[in-house]
Amino acid sequence: ELSCASNSDELLLQRQQLLASGKDDKGGVLRSRIHKEQRQIAIENFDLDKANKVLDVLAKNDTWQIPTLTLNTASKRRPFATKEWQESFTYLPKNVQEQWLNYINNLKKTEVTPFNEKYSKWMFDMTKRVHDKGIKIMAGTDTPIYFLTPGRSLHEELAVLVEAGLSPLEAIKAATKNPAEYFNLENELGSIAKNNWADLVILDANPLVDINNTKKINAVIKQGNYFDRTQLDLLLDQLKTTK
């Protein structure tokens, strides 16, 4: 986003100064400071010609992308307000629930800002541009940032990738075949084949018709061990009661 701004050279100089002055800070703190000071300015000064040049370089260099759309649109979409998220929240350790609730209750008191809306749209548009340029995409969530729960957040990421313009099959590949290819593990992961890892999710409905069908899990095969729906529900119940 910073390289796609009309004032990218100015932002780069400022960023170098921020990095120099914050050399003793933790990486996460420094990254957040840069985002806070530069992200909105960069988006307000978005330059399509510059963006296309950046994307051309990424495509030429075969630089794969992980949009983390669920995370980068969370300030607008507020996933923690949904029923599905609230269900997944109950499986987290109690101390994590308590810590998150303090932040969430404060967030609920704030309104979605015009910039939240604009940045969310920018992320969807840019992900589509990345896809249209033929740049490989992988699915990632950066859980637990912004209260994204493990497991559920990946299903959500597949859905928003489709919303951004990928087909359901392309979204599924972004979470399976593409990462295996990126890490040169095609002969072990990412596809159903003899001698590959026996890690599978069996669904009750076709995700190519509706990507949200990835959540309709009938059974899981993990390292060759079969868990039907009853066994999966039992594991979830145990998780709730043993934290």
Write out the residue ranges for each language-model feature:
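Short, acidic/turn-prone active-site loops that include or flank metal/cofactor-
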Residues: 1-7, 225
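Active-site neighborhoods of metal-dependent hydrolases
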Residues: 6-164, 239
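Solvent-exposed coil/turn segments that connect beta secondary-structure elements
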Residues: 70, 205-207, 225, 232
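Glycine/Thr-rich phosphate-binding loops of Rossmann-like dinucleotide-binding domains
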Residues: 74-75, 211, 230
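Short aromatic-centered micro-motifs
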Residues: 220
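Extracellular/periplasmic ectodomains of large secreted or surface enzymes and adhesion receptors
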Residues: 225-243
